[in-house]
Amino acid sequence: MSILNIPCRVALGAAALLAAIAPVSAGGDSERGRTLYESRCIACHSIDTNRVGPLHRGVFGRKAGGVSDYDYSPAVKNSQIVWNETTLDRWLANPERLIPGQKMGYQVSEASDRGDIIAFLKKQMQN
């Protein structure tokens, strides 16, 4: 291997790594996300009111545990996490791994489903 090829290989490797860790919701389908939200999330959550889980309107940029009239677990209240595409993706993939001791007992295993749900939630910021 030529020494001239090393910078190219490093650049390609870095680009591949960045693509692999980019938020999955960047190209999410918000309409499909609405359908997924209505079939998977609505039993516990609502966009505008607290239910078993906290409301979701305004979730982007909000600190985890930040809805004042919802009774969060101490783990969530003390987590210091701020919700964005990456943290929501990690949360939906495995809430207990992100915040041990939290109360949500549901996971979304498919990355494309998480991305679509996140795109739907993000769109609610505009409505």
Predicted regions mapped to residue ranges:
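Bacterial N-terminal signal peptides that target proteins for export
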Residues: 2-12
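Short Fe-S-cluster ligation motifs
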Residues: 69-89
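Short glycine/threonine-rich turn/loop motifs
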Residues: 54-74
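Sequence/structural segment immediately N-terminal to covalent heme-attachment motifs in c-type
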Residues: 28-51, 56
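Solvent-exposed, acidic/flexible segments
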Residues: 30, 34, 49, 81, ...
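C-terminal capping alpha-helices of c-type cytochrome domains
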Residues: 84-127
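Sec/Tat signal peptide C-region and signal peptidase I cleavage site
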Residues: 22-26
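Bacterial N-terminal signal peptides
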Residues: 11-20
